[in-house]
Amino acid sequence: MMRLLSILFMAACLNVFPFRVHAQLFHGTEKFTRADTLRGYLSPLRSCYDIRYYHLDVKVDISNKFISGSNLFRFTATTDFSQLQFDLFDNLKVEKVEFHGKPLPFKREYNAVFIDFPEVIKKGASEEFTVYYSGNPTVAKMAPWDGGFVFADDGNGKPWVATACQEIGASIWWPNKDHQSDEVDSMLLSVAVPNGLKDVSNGRLRKVTELNDGYTRFDWFISNPINNYGVALNIADYKHFSDTLVGEKGKLSLDYWVLPQNLKKAEVQFGNDVKRMLKAFEYWFGPYPFYSDGYKLIETPHLGMEHQSGIAYGNKYMPGYKGRDLSETGWGLKWDFIIVHESGHEWFGNNITSKDLADMWIHESFTNYSESLFIEYYYGKQAAQEYVHGTRKGILNDKPIIAPYNVNKSGSGDMYPKGGNLLNMIRVIINDDTKWREILRGLNTAFYHQTVTSTQIISYISEHAKRNFSKVFEQYLNHTTIPTLEWRYSEGKFYARWIANVQGFDMPVRVKRKGGDYAFIYPKTGSFSVVDLPGIKPENFEVDTFNFYIGLLKE
């Protein structure tokens, strides 16, 4: 979500369409460093252990913008090893690392920390160590477009604090194994805040303890696997109200934490859209993936983020995206963008997580597309496809959607609108809405609470659609040019072929004779093939460019 918000923020500043601004500011060839590799590469010093449990215990000194605490790492060894890597930004101090009650030697390189054990940890062994740390965390200049802490005022003279760290990584504020491929199985999050304030984090509140130093500790337990950037603190003088939804897996708790002055507005806005969203997404994607942890919306001083079971909300109770329809069709103003989009990530992003940041299209393309599925559930398929088509004006084709692997880099912001249009095309090609819904639900079942690769997702869709879509995905995800359908009319016959980067590109496309019904043709790259459509002539030849994001060229 951060990339989309970044694009939209710059657009707001320059009063032009967001994705165009992104191209102008960020276009260029990037060079990667040793620090990028340490952050993005799953080296043997990271793959040697499988993280099972964290207990993050942190105290937030708001006045001094200072944090201190510890994180317990409980893990299982996947191989024999005596050294491992965890991650913590170098502006934060590692006070000590303890193993069996004794300090461990450690060294730091950029934002990586390496520890040496006194003996070999054997494969299959379960062990734990604790990292004690402190410091002034990075303060985000404009969260969630950049990562870190947000220290704000709630408008009533009280502090309002939040974290947001997608892409830059959770190690910007707490020590962890900061690689998307390894999600912790469960986690206890203990947050001490000044008396009179509340911390609202992921999962369920287990305990509130008044300490003797002017602080109150809130213990939140997350019972499901969670990606590191999905772990969040939200601190304010929150007011709470709740509801329930009887969904596909029974009763789901709905909890809302908002600023006091916004309670009435929140009751209306959340009441209008949350249950509608959950009903639509359970229909399309299957049961909400985190029933045991519940569903929360938490008002934040930044726009929003898909923090698992605790969605950050900052859309100011307006329809659309802060009052705007990103598709310019009108359909985007019939719902709250942050509620729908960020909650869509509970299925694609939190339930299914990409192993590498390079494959973030798995999160963002599907969640962009989820917006249209929400529209379809309530307003019909035509409205949904109009919305998808309307988002095309945001496509830049500036760089590939899939980024280089192993350097913690995400690809083009086109993963939102171009990715959504790609998925709509795949659906049209499958030409079986029941099957398409089965595929979407099946993805969330087959990869339930898992980290995945692009290959796994594409292979699943191809297998269940009974059509190999690998070349279609490759063209749209790995190249900046879109395929062009070239056609010609000669001696009373129509001919067509694809011009594409991918050799053997073989996407079916819908065409028709004006006034007739659409039919699929199956052009290839290379030589022209005959288009067998009775009565077709240059003056009545039409291609379904409403649903197919392609170029057209007459020879």
Q: What is each stretch, according to the model?
A:
Residues 69, 165-166, 177-340:
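Hydrophobic helix-coil surface modules that form long, contiguous segments used
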Residues 25, 84, 89-152, 213-214, ...:
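A surface-exposed beta-strand-loop module
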Residues 223, 360, 364-425, 447:
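Acidic/His/Gly-enriched intrinsically disordered linker/tail segments
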Residues 289, 412-494:
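Amphipathic alpha-helical substructures
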Residues 35, 39, 44, 132-187, ...:
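Glycine/proline-rich low-complexity spacer/linker segments in large multi-domain proteins
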Residues 70-91, 175-179, 184-194, 455, ...:
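Surface-exposed beta-strand/loop patches in extracellular or lumenal glycoproteins
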Residues 93-99, 200, 469-470, 489-546:
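Beta-strand-rich binding/interaction modules
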Residues 22-68, 152-159, 179-181, 470-471:
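N-terminal, polar/Ser/Thr-rich
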